[in-house]
Amino acid sequence: MIFLMQNNTRLQRLILVFCLLSVLGCSGNGDKETPQLSDPTAPVGEERLTVPGSVKPILDVWMRDTYVTYHAADGFYYLTGTTASPDREFVGQTHCWDYNDGLYLWRSKDMKNWEEMGRIWSFDEDAAPWQKKGSPIKPGATSLNGDPLDSIYRAVWAPELHYIESKDKWLMVACLNGGNGSFVLESISGKPEGPYRNIQGNAEQAIFENIDLSLFEDDDGSVYLVGHNHFIAKMNEQLDGLAEPFRRIEETPYASEPYIEGVWIEKHDGQYHLLQTVWSVPQDDGSYSYIRDDKKDSVLHSYDVIVASADAVYGPYGPRYPAIIEGGHNNIFQDEHGDWWSTLFFNPRGVMGTRFDITCRPAVLPVKWEQGKLMPDAEAATAFYQDIHF
């Protein structure tokens, strides 16, 4: 009897320990939840999210990575982007994959009639030695599009022009090809057309080691650099360097992260919105996904804008959602009426790119926010483009 009682007591203790371990394992720090992931489904064919057919070039200049901003003080829209050297004779199609000569700027009162302001920064006259140097190209090399390349990588890509309201100052951010990093320029005249010089933080080397640098000014005047394509750093008060090292943005990723580019941060309705660009690819079941094998470029379909939102600029950003099909590497801005617009450039790559009559030209797309999400405004696009004949 004593033996049975002792065994029963021991069994009760074992059951109690097991129950305690079970409770601890299902609560508090012991709870290992499955990480949240973004849905990689690409809604190819969804008309309301696709760049409308009414959209056409607003300027007959070869350009990629179109950027537009509106400056209320003078009532002008300013346009820039990745351009090709205007006096260069190409073997085959116009491109910027090896070299170009600098940064160009246009302005307009209505986004339909553009005034050329010329080259506002050049390698030969304005660049620092590290920017002029470039990188050699192997003989016989071609671009991703099959364009024959010259002997040097020395092109400036993806420029952005920003008026920093809290400092009454114009800055430009841009990057170099050939793995030579990104930089920030400041206008020494206080005007958007410059002339421009390097800030101290990139006088001798790149301020960010990769491409596609962007800039964001918050409501409190804090200015951040946002880099390819998951990094952010606050600038110092003088805007001549960084106040902190670049850190990784907290995101909700896909199960397998693809190549992502064209970063942009915008604040709307108290939230921060992280815009990025990613390619869709077809799946065996007929659907499309943003998860792909980066080596299979031949199956690229559409060049899409995805968006994620957060309550803080560093994140965490929630699940990504598709916003603009075939409108990638964009920025968004508000016009003089407070209406929203996005930029695009008719990327020739991918299946959808082959459908364009003309590619690599700047365009703008009216967009809207519906239930906190960004999307094209097809009705406004039709109205804007009805008297533009290209």
Spans of features found by a protein language model:
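C-terminal motif of bacterial Sec signal peptides marking the signal peptidase cleavage site
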Residues: 23-25
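Bacterial N-terminal signal peptides that target proteins for export
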Residues: 4-15
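Carbohydrate-active catalytic/glycan-binding domains of CAZyme proteins
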Residues: 27-390
